[in-house]
Amino acid sequence: MKKTFVLLLALCMAAVFFAVPVFAEGDGNAQPAAAPVNTQEALEQALAAAAPAGGTVTLAADITLKTPITVPANVTLDGARTYTLTADTDFNGSYVVLATGNLSNVTVNAAGKANYAVQVYGETANVTLTNVVMQNGNYSGLVVNNGASASLKGCTFAGNGFSAVELADGKDHSGAAPKLTVDSLTDEVTVRADVSANAQPVLTVENGNPVLTGKVNGQTVYANNSEAMLAALCNTQGATEIALGGNINLENPLKITQPVAVNGNGHELTVTKDITGVSGYGNAVTVEADGVKLSNLTVNANNNAKYAVHVYGAQNVTLDKVTAVNGNYNGVLVNGATVTMKDMTFRNNGGSKEMGGIELGKGTNVQNTPKVTLEGTVNSDKLDKVLYVDTQQVDAANAAGAIENKTSNLNITVGADGSVTVVDKNAKPDPKPEEKPSTPAPSAPAKANPKTGVKA
């Protein structure tokens, strides 16, 4: 009995000092639970641990960052559709996240402390960003740099300085141009290219919608082909060029206050809402800046605007291959401005009124006498009404000086009363009555040969 007690005591002491882990049945391969990713240190450790084999690191909390983090090439950082990475007040870095791997379901907030929320960098980078919010970058939400490629799906941008996305060469880079694929361009997603002339970026819009392009301060801007983006570019300081990617409907008057060249590329602006009652701007397009050029463009007032184009007080404006149609009054109104018109077309303007093409006047608060210079071919369905000088605003004595017929197809005569007579010098006049060919008399019916019965 004593020996048995001693043996049991020894076994108990061994159990205390040499404890053996106990696993539930079937848990022979169980591992310790991963630490939650809720601090910058934990995030960096999780990304490093995932890098060799790849995989997904999922945030467990909002994280404030003091320095940038890098997502490795074969890793996806996921925000669980809930969490945000935010630059701290003393953040030190040009970007918040360097993405050589993928991002999904996360918000990256530069908080005005970094130039970019996300950077995709290098020719080997081919990154997909899915449902990522990029906001409050001093320059842009996203920069795609040094020949990198990025694909955006369901991404949004807010509060960024110059554009949603920047495509850049990067310092001392002379290789491939950056590539960007987006599922769609919205009015909130503008793309700015800061690249050399030899490395033009590649932009692909997957839904196939047209793209509006422009030049602002020497950089190319890609935007949604919409009324809002066209209006924004026409009134952005530093804008010099705009090219339409497709037709645009206008629900508001389009004002042009910057010296831009707008190339319609054969497309049309159509007014879809009655704007005739808009004070001072009841016209489809109103040009108020010197040096504006409109080309290869149809402006369709659609009987919803007084004029298709109104040039107000601006100098050295050019309309080249512009078609002005369906204005309630004339196609183009020139108020105290100087305009050169080349190869113009006017149709269906003025309705039943004695109007149809170009009207010259002064308008409100304008002292200068208007002047139009005509070049090339002027086409109009009301050629006799293609030029009209408002002698209530322009003295009849000055009417002739308001029209310079430089190289056009028109013969223009301005009367002492300011009335204008127009004839197309290339038109063939109707022949005089005595020159018109007479209608030949009908020939008598042929008689049959009595011998053969055959008609001659």
Features from the language model and the residues they span:
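Intrinsically disordered, low-complexity repeat and linker tracts
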Residues: 1, 13, 22-33, 199-218, ...
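Generic short beta-strand segments
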Residues: 60-63, 107, 245-248, 298-300, ...
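Gram-positive cell-envelope targeting signals
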Residues: 1-25, 46, 59, 142, ...
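Charge-rich, solvent-exposed alpha-helical interaction surfaces
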Residues: 42, 46, 181, 204, ...
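Surface-exposed loop/turn motifs in large extracellular/passenger domains
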Residues: 72-76, 93-107, 119-131, 144-159, ...
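Acidic Gly/Asp/Thr-rich repetitive segments characteristic of extracellular carbohydrate-active
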Residues: 30-58, 64, 211-245
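N-terminal extracellular ligand-recognition/capping segment immediately after the signal peptide
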Residues: 40-41, 56-75, 80-88, 240-260, ...
